[in-house]
Amino acid sequence: MTDTVPPRAALRQRSLVVKATSGLDRPEAANQAFTVAAAAVAAGVEVSVWLTGEAAWFGLPGRAAELELEHAAPLPDLLDAVLAAGTLTVCTQCAARRGITADDVLPGVRIAGAAVFVEEALREGAQALVY
């Protein structure tokens, strides 16, 4: 008998925290953050995406559709994949600076601060990426 864990089972024991810092100002970075997050969700990984800076706008209805990037999956599709099986959070300070409230964001999107981000990023088995 082997003690080797199957790859998918091993992935389920890990979590991925993705911090998206770019919006329409840097479309490739913005799309890449969601592409990686959606791929991780599809692999069965626990995923949390944090929308900071200009990426905070993607937490609002219709905003993801404004990003168009050739040869990339549409951002609304990627965002929906993350929302279906992961967590999507808008940074508290970023939301406040942009006048975004809990009533403004998409269903399933939360607004939370740095303490929650640090807790998620430092959780055992977590990997954090910043785009």
Task: Give the positions of each predicted feature.
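Histidine-anchored nucleotide/phosphate-binding helix
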Residues: 30-44
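Positively charged, low-complexity intrinsically disordered leader regions
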Residues: 2-9
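N-terminal beta-loop-helix "entrance" segment that forms/cooperates
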Residues: 55-69
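Residues at the starts of beta-strands that form the adenosine-phosphate
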Residues: 15, 46-48, 87
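Aromatic- and Gly/Pro-rich donor/ligand-binding loops
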Residues: 129-131
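A short aromatic-anchored loop/beta-hairpin motif
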Residues: 98, 102-106, 111-122
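A glycine-rich helix N-cap at a beta->alpha junction
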Residues: 65-95
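Short, glycine-rich nucleotide/cofactor-binding loops
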Residues: 15-31, 62-63
